[in-house]
Amino acid sequence: MPFIKAVKSSPYFSRYQTKYRRRREGKTDYYARKRLIAQAKNKYNAPKYRLVVRFSNRFVTCQIVSSRVNGDYVLAHAHSSELPRYGIKWGLANWTAAYATGLLVARRALAKVGLADKYEGVTEPEGEFELTEAIEDGPRPFKVFLDVGLKRTSTGSRVFGAMKGASDGGLFIPHSPNRFPGFDIETEELDDETLRKYIYGGHVAEYMEMLIDDDEERYQKQFSGLIADGIESDQLEDIYAEAYAKIREDPSFQKSGKDAAAFKAESLKHTQRKLTAEERKERFNAKVIEAGRA
């Protein structure tokens, strides 16, 4: 009798255990989270920090986060919407913007814990694979672990751009080069030139030049912001290099200057107010009267 219908009886429902809410919503991988936050049992009051990297359609978010019993605590936060302050006004979600955001959160976190002058990282990145090493007769480097969430860790992914930026910014992030752009699986070697090209927006410049030759209309549409500002492909490297230098000079957070009250009032214009019990009764009575007339 292979076709017996499974009957979910009362014992089934009484023993049923629901999964965590964020697992049901598909937001958290608890298998990975458990391993990211579990601390050694012989350490006390020594938080385990994570570099949390998340992407939206337009921006990149990087945070240095530690977990406690009552929730996660954010030590430092950086958002790619802050990059126009440093001269990067376009493509705030691409690989190079992820690198810049990672660099910004690293410098901001080190400044907060007083290690910015001791661990400067890679001031002039050339695409080489480097890990932050401890200095002699000084404090150890600030150690974090990469938290990619649910993002797929493909070779060349933007999440590793943020990690590379944070590593070059002076944080110690245990990693290998085999997920960076330019890594050859067969020879197991990293092409420094390819990685450097991504750090300074060279892949964007190449794409711009290709569109100029092949599809002028698409170029005008896709790079309208750069065209409006008179930026050409050969200027991108200098723009990104200057932005990295400015981030190192002043990584501090600055408020946007928007009026919070005005912003709230504007957002409430599109929010429907919940009716009171009296208003619901009045609306119901009005509908009954209208239906009786019909």
UniProtKB/Swiss-Prot annotation:
GO biological process, any: cytoplasmic translation
Q: Gene3D superfamilies this protein is in?
A: 3.30.420.100
PTM Phosphotyrosine: at which residues?
Y12
* Pfam entry (one): Ribosomal_L18_c
Summary of the function given for this chain in its UniProt record: Component of the ribosome, a large ribonucleoprotein complex responsible for the synthesis of proteins in the cell. The small ribosomal subunit (SSU) binds messenger RNAs (mRNAs) and translates the encoded message by selecting cognate aminoacyl-transfer RNA (tRNA) molecules. The large subunit (LSU) contains the ribosomal catalytic site termed the peptidyl transferase center (PTC), which catalyzes the formation of peptide bonds, thereby polymerizing the amino acids delivered by tRNAs into a polypeptide chain.
Name any GO cellular component annotation.
cytosolic large ribosomal subunit
Q: Quaternary form?
A: Component of the large ribosomal subunit (LSU). Mature yeast ribosomes consist of a small (40S) and a large (60S) subunit. The 40S small subunit contains 1 molecule of ribosomal RNA (18S rRNA) and 33 different proteins (encoded by 57 genes). The large 60S subunit contains 3 rRNA molecules (25S, 5.8S and 5S rRNA) and 46 different proteins (encoded by 81 genes). Component of a hexameric 5S RNP precursor complex, composed of 5S RNA, rrs1, rpf2, rpl5a/rpl5b, rpl11a/rpl11b and syo1; this complex acts as a precursor for ribosome assembly.
Name one molecular function that GO assigns to this entry. Answer: structural constituent of ribosome
Principal place where this protein is found? cytoplasm
| Signal peptide per UniProt | none
Compartments (UniProt record): Cytoplasm; Nucleus
Residues bearing Phosphoserine are S10, S81
> Would you tell me the protein name for this molecule?
Large ribosomal subunit protein uL18A
